[in-house]
Amino acid sequence: MLVRIVAVMLLLSAGIVAEAMSHSFVCKASGRLGGPIRFEFYRNSSTHPKTDIESFTVSIRTADDRWKTMWSIFSHRGLTEPIEYGVTPPGFTTMIKPQKLIPGHVYAGFASDGHGGSSKVTFGFDKDGTMIFLDNPLD
């Protein structure tokens, strides 16, 4: 019985530590088709830029409600400026080459800082190429 109590306490402690180590941050997307599409990252508001991004992926929502990677980059160095779609920042490595973004589809930008932090922005483009933002469909 004592072993079970200790095991449960250890599991609860591990869960609390894991929750404390994970956190989210803000990812803002801007731009339009035919022009630059930029992604900026902030700690908790638009006043404190976050530069310790280690990975960034843009994915498309498929017809069977899954995500397919359209572009993916990785680094251990961090950012000095916003990420522009299809342009690999200095110090980053392209894992998957960028594919063309088209109107009428749902996309998501996923970012990780390498120490438990993550962010996601869901977006699309209307017929004239204007970026529109979506409320995380089918998550």
Regions found by a protein language model. Give the residues of each.
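Sec-dependent N-terminal signal peptides
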Residues: 5-14
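N-terminal non-catalytic regions of secreted/periplasmic and cell-surface proteins
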Residues: 17-64, 120-139
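Extended, solvent-exposed segments with strong compositional bias
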Residues: 59-96
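Surface-exposed, short loops/turns at beta-strand junctions within beta-sandwich domains
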Residues: 98-104
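Short beta-strand segments enriched for Tyr within beta-sheet-rich domains
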Residues: 105-109
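Short acidic/polar inter-strand loop motif in beta-rich domains
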Residues: 113-120
